[in-house]
Every structure is written in structure tokens, then in C-alpha cells.
A protein has these predicted regions:
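Sec-dependent N-terminal signal peptides
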Residues: 4-14
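Domain-level detector for secreted/extracellular nuclease and nuclease-toxin modules, and
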Residues: 17-268
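A boundary/linker detector
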Residues: 2-3, 20
Length: 268
């Protein structure tokens, strides 16, 4: 039934808005196979389905990124996208205003929740990772892609990790990126809609040839510590979030990569 609910939400969205206009890319399985297919199997990127599982069973697909939305926390539990050289071409787009995401049927957080809160509207998929087109760049300013972040965290250690991710995407000929806040435990909230403020943020990267994977778990606080000090196993992030990352990887590869904590395979 969870799969049917996801398909229903996507169909309802398409009936309300133009899928083409809002960049929703949906592949709906044969009705007889709905109970056999997981939400992450519904949309395939190239020949590798890199989407995680969803604890909310509410997943949306845009042209530039996909996300699992948590209405309880008024933000996405994960945002997933592919990052290659072409996505980072030099551009000088004007920054749009932050807006609610029209494809979220329950309505994503109103940007006014952040006003005078002391928190930045922190991107999960950075605008700098979506410079390929103005349309994809603008998508990153929907609040479905935003989480509350301390300014010195957003502009500090988190920004350093985003820049390093771009470096690796170039060095290793592309990456799959999954990122979000850990929406578990006791958290502060802001605004009338009580947007949760994560205590930790995570970022998981895997090379497109599936030979390297790395996970970062970063406390939501200012830090000048080297990025490698935040490296953890993907297994640890799975335990904290309840999310299964890369479930479509061959089991022996998934188990080996997700248990690794060594950062020496990556150029820091």
C-alpha cells in the first residue's frame, strides 16, 4: 500500500500542476507490479538506481534532484542527485527568491519560518551544483531543498564540504550525492510551522563506477576541523536515520563500501 500511496501522490501532483512545467520525471510501474516494486525502483537514473529508501513514503522527482519529504519536520530527509562537470559550468544567474515547492502536495515550509530566526536557509543540493541551466539552478531555491542552518556552519564547514564535493566530482568523473539533516531525536524548531533544526547533517558520495563511497556526519555547529575528521561509515548514518542507502547496489559491494571508514582513497 505504501507504493500505491506514492504513485497516488505523484499522479495527484500531475493532475494539479503540469509535470513538464515543474520538472517531475516519473516512471510508473505496471499496476500488477505495484506491490513488487519499492519507491526507489520507481525512478531510475541511467543504468543505476541510486535513490535511498524513504521513511516517509513520500518521494518527489525534479529535473535537478529528487527528495523524500518529511511533513512532520517540514523539510526533506534526503535530497539525491548526480553531479558532473557539466553541472558546474561558470554562470552568473540572478538568485531567485526562496519559495514553497509547488509539487509538494502537503506544502513545503513557508520561507517566512526562517525570518528573524537566526538561521540561514541552508541548501541541501547547493545552487552551485546546478549551474547547467537557469531552470535547474532556480529549483534549488524551493524550500523542499532547504534546512535551517547556523550561518557560521552554512558558510563554514558545510560550504567547505560542498566545495570538496565539486572537486571530487571533477576528479572522479562524476558522483552520486545524497544529503540531508538527521531528523531524529530532540530538535529545536523555528517558525509557526515548527521547522525542525537538525543536530547533525550528513552527506554521502559514491563514484559512478561504484568503486569508492564516503560518508560524512557533521555536527550542526561551527567548526574549523579538517573534513576527514567527519568521515564515518555509511552504516552509521543508516543507523541514525533509519534510511537504507544504495539498496540497488549488488549486496557484496554495498556491504563492503558501507562498512568502510577510510578516507585515504579520497584526495583531501
Amino acid at each position: 500500500m505504501t507504493n500505491i500511496r506514492i504513485i497516488f501522490l505523484l499522479l495527484l501532483t500531475c493532475s494539479t500542476f503540469s509535470c513538464k512545467e515543474y520538472g517531475i520525471e516519473i516512471v510508473i510501474p505496471n499496476a500488477n507490479e505495484l506491490e513488487k516494486k519499492s519507491a526507489t525502483e520507481a525512478v531510475i537514473s541511467g543504468d543505476f538506481n541510486f535513490y535511498p529508501t524513504s521513511t516517509t513514503n513520500v518521494v518527489y522527482f525534479r529535473k535537478g534532484f529528487s527528495f523524500s519529504y518529511s511533513e512532520t519536520h517540514e523539510q526533506s530527509e534526503w535530497v539525491a542527485y548526480e553531479l558532473t562537470d557539466k553541472d558546474m559550468v561558470a554562470t552568473n544567474y540572478n538568485r531567485p527568491y526562496f519559495n514553497q515547492d509547488p509539487i509538494v502536495t502537503t506544502a513545503s515550509a513557508d520561507w517566512r519560518n526562517f525570518k528573524n530566526s537566526g538561521y540561514d536557509r541552508g541548501h541541501l543540493c547547493p545552487a552551485g551544483d546546478r549551474k547547467y541551466s537557469k531552470e535547474l539552478y532556480d529549483e534549488t531555491f524551493f524550500t523542499s531543498n532547504i534546512a535551517p542552518q547556523i550561518p557560521s556552519f552554512n558558510n563554514g564547514v558545510w560550504n567547505r564540504l560542498e566545495q570538496k564535493t565539486r572537486y571530487w566530482a571533477t576528479k572522479y568523473n562524476g558522483l552520486y550525492v545524497i544529503t540531508g539533516g538527521v531528523l531524529k531525536g530532540e530538535m529545536k524548531t523555528i517558525g509557526k510551522e515548527k521547522v525542525a533544526v537538525p543536530n547533525y547533517f550528513y552527506k554521502i558520495l559514491i563514484t559512478k563506477d561504484h568503486t569508492k563511497m564516503i560518508g560524512f556526519l557533521v555536527p550542526h555547529e561551527p567548526s574549523k576541523a579538517p573534513l576527514y575528521s567527519f568521515v564515518v561509515t555509511v552504516d552509521e548514518i543508516e543507523k541514525l536515520t533509519g534510511i537504507d542507502f544504495f539498496p540497488e547496489l549488488e549486496d557484496t559491494i554495498e556491504n563492503r563500501l558501507e562498512a568502510e571508514v577510510s578516507y585515504k582513497k579520497w584526495s583531501f
